[in-house]
């Protein structure tokens, strides 16, 4: 079975669903840390203005309450990749694929199924804080490595920021997907191409219930198709010809 790892996003689209949160012990440790910080502290950590820091301070205080605004993670995050993922009006098969095969790598929650209910927050692995005297990457490493202890095929749609949370040994198990545009023989890629293509690729995998690498290689999405010459056992490259 294939499991697909995707990153979080800074941009969020919040819905008002109030419920009692279920939080892991590690998540609670991070919340306890941030809930003690002042607005001034958050300005420095996030490098944001006072108004934005006040908003973040309130969010961390809200985590300490018994009820929170919760959203399915796949619908809360709303960056470019997420906006190119089919997230609404899913068929039964598509919903099952989303629940069982798509996982979000979070600096607050760990690795979670895409439909997990979570709350709005600002935190990534580049945030310069220490939790139990460790960076966030080190703090989560054992949890992330444990996720890799299965026979599933691990497909990474992650940036380097998220992949380096895994130990080097576990990182070697990841299958990376690359997305390139061919413009008159010139191969080009940049973050916008990659983010859009990741979302389109994930949608195609979900719609086709893709469970093997061979099936993945056969997919066509948004003009992209698999290029064997530019690929190897750990790097699958998809090319889109532009005229």
UniProtKB/Swiss-Prot annotation:
Q: List the disulfide bonds.
A: none
Segments crossing the lipid bilayer:
none
Q: Which domain of life is it from?
A: Bacteria
Q: Name one GO cellular component term.
A: cytosol
InterPro entries according to UniProt: YaaA
Query: What are its GO biological-process terms?
Result: response to hydroperoxide
Q: Which Pfam families match?
A: H2O2_YaaD (PF03883)
Which family is this sequence assigned to?
Belongs to the UPF0246 family.
Give the NCBIfam families listed for this entry.
Answer: PRK02101.1-4
Name it. Answer: UPF0246 protein gbs2036
């Amino acid at each position: 079975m294939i499991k697909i790892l995707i990153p979080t996003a800074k941009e969020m689209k919040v819905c008002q669903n109030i419920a009692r949160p279920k939080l892991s012990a590690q998540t609670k440790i991070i919340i306890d840390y941030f809930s003690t910080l002042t607005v001034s502290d958050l300005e420095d950590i996030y490098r944001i203005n006072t108004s934005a820091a006040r908003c973040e301070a309130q969010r961390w205080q809200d985590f300490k309450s018994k009820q929170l605004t919760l959203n399915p993670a796949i619908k809360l995050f709303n960056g470019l990749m997420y906006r190119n993922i089919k997230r609404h009006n899913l068929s039964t098969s598509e919903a099952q694929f989303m629940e069982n095969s798509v996982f979000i790598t979070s600096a607050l929650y760990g690795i979670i199924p895409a439909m997990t209910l979570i709350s709005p927050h600002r935190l990534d692995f580049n945030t310069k804080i220490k939790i139990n005297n460790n960076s966030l990457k080190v703090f989560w490493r054992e949890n992330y490595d444990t996720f890799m202890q299965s026979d599933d095929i691990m497909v990474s749609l992650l940036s380097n920021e998220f992949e380096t949370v895994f130990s080097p040994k576990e990182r070697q198990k990841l299958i990376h997907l690359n997305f390139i545009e061919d413009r008159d023989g010139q191969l080009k890629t940049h973050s916008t191409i990659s983010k859009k293509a990741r979302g389109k690729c994930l949608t195609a995998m979900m719609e086709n219930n893709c469970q093997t690498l061979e099936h993945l290689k056969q997919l066509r999405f948004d003009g992209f198709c698999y290029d064997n010459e530019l690929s190897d056992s750990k790097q699958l490259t998809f090319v889109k010809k532009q005229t």
